[in-house]
Curated annotation (Swiss-Prot):
A motif (YXXL motif) lies at residues 718-721. Disulfide bonds join C59-C79, C124-C212, C131-C203, C136-C160, C225-C254, C235-C246, C303-C337, C383-C446, C390-C419, C604-C610. Residues 303-336 are annotated as: V3. Highly glycosylated by host. The high number of glycan on the protein is reffered to as 'glycan shield' because it contributes to hide protein sequence from adaptive immune system. Palmitoylation of the transmembrane protein and of Env polyprotein (prior to its proteolytic cleavage) is essential for their association with host cell membrane lipid rafts. Palmitoylation is therefore required for envelope trafficking to classical lipid rafts, but not for viral replication. Residues 725-749 are annotated as: Disordered. Residues 668-689 are annotated as: MPER. This is Envelope glycoprotein gp160. Residues 580-598 are annotated as: Immunosuppression. It comes from Human immunodeficiency virus type 1 group M subtype B (isolate KB-1/ETR) (HIV-1). Keywords: AIDS, Apoptosis, Clathrin-mediated endocytosis of virus by host, Cleavage on pair of basic residues, Coiled coil, Disulfide bond, Fusion of virus membrane with host endosomal membrane, Fusion of virus membrane with host membrane, Glycoprotein, Host cell membrane, Host endosome, Host membrane, Host-virus interaction, Lipoprotein, Membrane, Palmitate, Signal, Transmembrane, Transmembrane helix, Viral attachment to host cell, Viral envelope protein, Viral immunoevasion, Viral penetration into host cytoplasm, Virion, Virus endocytosis by host, Virus entry into host cell. Belongs to the HIV-1 env protein family. A lipid is attached at C769 (S-palmitoyl cysteine). Residues 369-379 are annotated as: CD4-binding loop.
Length: 861
């Protein structure tokens, strides 16, 4: 019965135990689940994230492929060599916004081209001495009697004479030169006279600089490149209009080769559209905005200056040579350009169709320029070193009806554009700067490809209700070279790579024993931008490979830039490109060091995935873990937490500082753990070495003391008979001391030669300690005595100086008192005498009436 009762009681307890066990398991599972939901901030290095930015671009070019003797204006010899295998990484599932009208690359290119143009003219000759009166007549014939002048060229060339200073400054001689009519203006406004006074056209507003003889204006393709840490996004949509989102995006380090062709109305030798003609404008409804047309097929334009010129030198003083046209050999004919009429009409029809779609099926009319500067009214470009101004009215003289029919008149197979030539040009519409292009010998021929147009739309028609409301008139435009560069740079934008990313994970940083790690981090940013369209989880797998490309790419780019800078050392000054390259070098290193500095501050040096102890706050983003890592790209995630990035960075820094402080405190407590290392077997060899050194030192010390003892005994006239040292007999005058007295044993007493290693070590150590003690005691006594003597002498000197000071102080006091007394006595005596004199004078004055009365009395008596 007793057993059954106990069994029943234990069954009750067993039931409670099972319930307790299940409760504990459930509580543990709940704790694990709750712990699993806790997310922590993790730092990732090498994430495919970028932001729009503006930075200094540098150039790359194949300058060696062109004439090495002629110095081209664009200074492409100072550029970095182009990459023979340029990388272009397609960004899948990426949509990016572009805006060609607000692209800093256009402004940079415009400023660079102007600066290069100005810099190429700096060492050239200023033609200020030519700003004199020119006596000009129309060129009627040449030295060849069989030659003739074309009717259109009559009056186009002026034969002018003028006075210039020779090599001797006070001597003037008469020279002559041929000028184009566009380059001179009459002074007396008399155009009918056969011999009129003229002046150069820009003398009243600008400083004219002659282009150096070997300067070439041939456009060489320039590739604009971004420094390390930046990249170019390229839109590959074939019908991209320049603004808005682009879904076919790739990333490159450099642009394609852009020829810096300076022209108006027609865009020459540019890039073509891949699918049909493309028209682009910032605002089609605003007639002030220029319309940029990109063709899909080129139209050939062949130009010629048939005149065979000679060039002569005119000296304008010491060190100044002016190049002018000497004479024209053969017939004098007008320069002109030829364009295929069929190709041009086909191109205009395609452009009209695009414009008709944009402007609601209206009739499209192309008309000539409405007026303005010659650069705007005519098609202006450079052909073989001469600046052509061609009349383009024949190109823009057609009507395209809304039903698809058009009218352009009839004519020969080719359209011939008459061209005039100017030698004095005012480039870039800048005030105060003009350039004189020296004449080119012989005939000039050039062939170009028309790849685009610059158009302007007449305003006002769409707002009227008359019959012309359905007509849109377009005229050739240009003049702002930014539109020329924009027609090539429309597909690019500069972005700044942001390789640092933060995201929530379930991993928390643990404090472990830290070991040194040497991790090489590597270079080109384009490699890891390839994962931009992937989800965050897929992109994080390739972080190591992507980040390792960073540093080698920077180093390679730096080496290329240095080689380009070295190529300019023979010049006295860097070109614009040299300065850009130096800026790019500094910028690349600065970006890399900045990122590495942040990684170091966060305790993540050498890591690509770095956990932290900062808990993730759901207020930053309330998306779930799976939603973040499985559905979002890094770019989307960056936009999600962009407002909290700086806050997260600060929290990571504070957490790292606290962790380092905790580690320092922990290491201070763990110092005692190092005591157990003394008993490690790896330390035994070191202990044996120390023991051997101690024994060797003691043996050497024993030998030294023995030799010193023998020498001391020999000096006292005693020679030991054996190694057994006997105790000397003591006389009554040298008591050893008794037990009650407790006196010290005599130092001259010696002990027997002991046996055994330990006894020998003990005796030697005792002897060493006693020897050191006695010597140190003697030295201390000597020092004490010396200090005592010096103190006594010093005290006596101080007392003597004090007494001397007191004596002289008393003497000075007595002297001062004596001087004061003498001065007081002298002053008192002087004062008494003055008072006495005053008293006598006063009495004398008082006695004057008495004396007078006494005198009168005597006189009366």
């Amino acid at each position: 019965m007793r057993v059954k009762e106990i069994r029943k009681n234990y069954q009750h307890l067993w039931r409670w135990g099972i319930m307790l066990r299940w409760g504990t398991m459930l509580l543990g599972m709940l704790m694990i689940c709750s712990a699993a939901e806790q997310l922590w901030v993790t730092v990732y290095y090498g994430v495919p994230v970028w932001k729009e930015a503006t930075t200094t671009l540098f150039c790359a070019s194949d300058a060696k492929a062109y004439d090495t003797e002629a110095h081209n204006v664009w200074a492409t010899h100072a550029c970095v060599p182009t990459d023979p295998n340029p990388q272009e990484v397609v960004l899948v599932n990426v949509t990016e916004n572009f805006n060609m009208w607000k692209n800093n690359m256009v402004e940079q290119m415009h400023e660079n081209i102007i600066s290069l143009w100005d810099q190429s003219l700096k060492p050239c000759v200023k033609l200020t001495p030519l700003c004199v009166t020119l006596h000009c007549t129309d060129l009627r014939n040449t030295t060849n009697n069989n030659s003739s002048i074309e009717e259109k060229m009559k009056g186009e060339i002026k034969n002018c004479s003028f006075n210039v200073t020779t090599n001797i400054r006070d001597k003037v001689q008469k020279e002559y030169a041929l000028f184009y009519k566009l380059d001179v203006v009459p002074i007396d406004n008399d155009n009918n006279s056969t011999n009129t006074c003229y002046r150069l056209i820009s003398c009243d507003t600008s400083v004219i600089t002659q282009a150096c003889p070997k300067v070439s204006f041939e456009p060489i393709p320039i590739h604009y490149c971004t420094p390390a840490g930046f990249a170019l996004l390229k839109c590959n949509n074939k019908t991209f209009n320049g603004t808005g989102p682009c879904k076919n995006v790739s990333t490159v380090q450099c642009t394609h080769g852009i020829r810096p062709v300076v022209s108006t109305q027609l865009l020459l030798n540019g890039s073509l559209a891949e699918e049909g003609v493309v028209i682009r404008s910032e605002n089609f409804t605003d007639n002030v905005k220029t319309i940029i047309v990109q063709l899909n097929e080129t139209v050939k334009i062949n130009c010629i200056r048939p005149n065979n010129k000679t060039r002569k030198r005119v000296t304008m003083g010491p060190g100044r040579v002016y190049y002018t046209t000497g004479e024209i050999i053969g017939d004098i004919r007008q320069a002109h350009c030829n364009i295929s009429r069929a190709e041009w009409n086909k191109t205009l029809e395609q452009i009209a169709n695009k414009l008709r779609k944009q402007f609601e099926n209206k009739t499209i009319v192309f008309n000539q320029s409405s007026g303005g500067d010659p650069e705007i009214v005519m098609h202006n470009f450079n052909c073989g070193g001469e600046f052509f101004y061609c009349d383009s009215s024949q190109l823009f003289n057609s009507t395209h009806l809304s039903n698809g029919t058009w009218w352009n008149g009839t004519g020969p197979e080719n359209i011939t554009l008459p061209c005039r030539i100017k030698q004095i040009v005012n480039m870039w519409q800048e005030v105060g700067k003009a350039m004189y292009a020296p004449p080119i010998r012989g005939q000039i021929r050039c062939s170009s490809n028309i790849t685009g147009l610059l158009l302007t739309r007449d305003g006002g028609n769409t707002q009227n209700n008359n019959t012309n409301s359905s007509i849109e008139i377009f005229r050739p435009g240009g003049g702002d070279m930014r539109d020329n560069w924009r027609s090539e740079l429309y597909k690019y934008k500069v972005v700044k790579i942001e390789p640092l990313g933060v995201a929530p994970t379930r991993a928390k940083r643990r404090v472990v024993q830290r070991e040194k790690r040497a991790v090489g981090i590597g270079a080109v940013f384009l490699g890891f931008l390839g994962a931009a369209g992937s989800t965050m989880g897929a992109a994080a797998v390739t972080l190591t490979v992507q980040a390792r490309q960073l540093l080698p790419g920077i180093v390679q780019q730096q080496n290329n830039l240095l080689r380009a800078i070295d190529a300019q050392q023979h010049l006295l000054q860097l070109t614009v490109w040299g300065i850009k390259q130096l800026q790019a070098r500094v910028l690349a290193v600065e970006r890399y060091l900045k990122d590495q500095q942040l990684m170091g501050i966060w305790g993540c040096s050498g890591k690509f995935i770095c956990t932290t102890a900062v808990p993730w706050n759901t207020s930053w983003s309330n998306k779930s873990f799976n939603e973040i890592w499985d559905n979002m790209t890094w770019m989307e995630w960056e936009r999600e937490i962009n407002n909290y990035t700086n806050l997260i960075y600060n929290l990571i820094e504070e957490s790292q500082n606290q962790q380092e402080k905790n580690e320092q405190d922990l290491l201070a407590l763990d110092k005692w753990d190092s005591l157990w290392n003394w008993f490690s077997i790896t330390k035994w060899l070191w202990y044996i070495k120390i023991f051997i050194m101690i024994v060797g030192g003691l043996v050497g010390l024993r030998i030294v003391f023995t030799v010193l003892s023998i020498v001391n005994r020999v000096r006292q006239g005693y020679s030991p008979l054996s190694f057994q040292t006997r105790l000397p007999a003591r006389g009554p005058d040298r008591p050893e001391g008794i037990e009650e007295e407790g006196g010290e044993r005599d130092r001259d007493r010696s002990g027997p030669l002991v046996d055994g290693l330990l006894a020998l070590i003990w005796v030697d150590l005792r002897s060493l300690c006693l020897f050191s003690y006695h010597r140190l005691r003697d030295l201390l006594l000597i020092v004490t005595r010396t200090v005592e003597l010096l103190g006594r002498k010093g005290w006596e000197v101080l007392k003597y100086l004090w007494n001397l000071l007191q004596y002289w102080s008393q003497e000075l006091k007595n002297s001062a008192v004596s001087l004061l007394n003498a001065t007081a006595i002298a002053v008192a005596e002087g004062t008494d005498r003055v008072i006495e004199i005053l008293q006598r004078t006063y009495r004398a004055i008082l006695h004057i009436p008495v004396k007078i009365r006494q005198g009168l009395e005597r006189a009366l008596l």
